[in-house]
Structures are given as structure tokens and as C-alpha cells.
Design a protein with these regions (language model features):
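Catalytic core of pol beta-like nucleotidyltransferases
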Residues: 1-22, 30-32, 36, 47-104
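Short beta-strand->loop micro-motif that forms the acidic, two-metal-ion catalytic signature
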Residues: 40-45
Length: 104
């Protein structure tokens, strides 16, 4: 399976379990520098009052299946959208995501 197909399958799977989530691809895959052993880095921003472990597992579960099927490691970070958008300061990580991230 090609990496672009993996990213498309990730997008479709996540939109099924979290239809209003914003999914941002970042890292080597977003920069077009991914190697065969590179992981796929994601930030998943959700519009929930709070983020529970149960809801996180509901979102992540389909990604485990895709990892097994594709052999590519998927590294998701789930955050509340309001916290991401209203953080009090920028970090090197957040600037990196904003500069190179691709919304899926």
C-alpha cells in the first residue's frame, strides 16, 4: 500500500468516528520527506467539552487496524480544538505544525 493511500485511509477512518474533527498531518510525511520506515504524525482536534480516555480510544482504535494492515506506524495526538487554538503561547512544536501541517 502506498503512503498516500495510507493517509487517505486514515482520513476516511477518522472522519467516520469523529466527523467534526480537524486532522492535521505534520512531520516528514507532510514535508514529502517520509522514508519507508517513517511514521505518520497527526494532530486530531476535537470539539468536545472534555477529552475522556474512552473517547480517545474510540478515535484511535481504527488507527491500530490500519497500522496492522499497512505496516506503517501512525502517531496520533488528540487535543481539544479550543485548547489548540487558544494556547497562551507558541511552542516550537506548535509553530512547526502550523508551518508544515496539512489539513486532511
Amino acid at each position: 500500500m502506498r503512503r498516500t493511500e495510507n493517509v487517505d485511509m486514515i482520513r476516511r477512518s477518522l472522519h467516520k468516528v469523529a466527523p467534526n474533527a480537524q486532522i492535521i498531518l505534520y512531520g516528514s510525511e507532510a514535508r514529502g520527506e517520509a522514508r519507508p520506515d517513517s511514521d505518520i504524525d497527526l494532530i486530531i482536534l476535537v470539539d468536545e467539552p472534555q477529552l475522556t480516555p474512552e473517547y480517545e480510544q474510540e478515535i484511535i482504535r481504527p488507527l491500530y487496524e490500519l497500522e496492522v494492515k499497512s505496516g506503517v506506524i501512525i502517531s496520533p495526538m488528540i487535543m481539544l480544538r479550543r485548547l489548540w487554538e487558544n494556547r497562551p503561547f507558541q511552542t516550537p512544536f506548535s509553530l512547526n505544525v502550523m508551518n508544515e501541517g496539512i489539513v486532511l
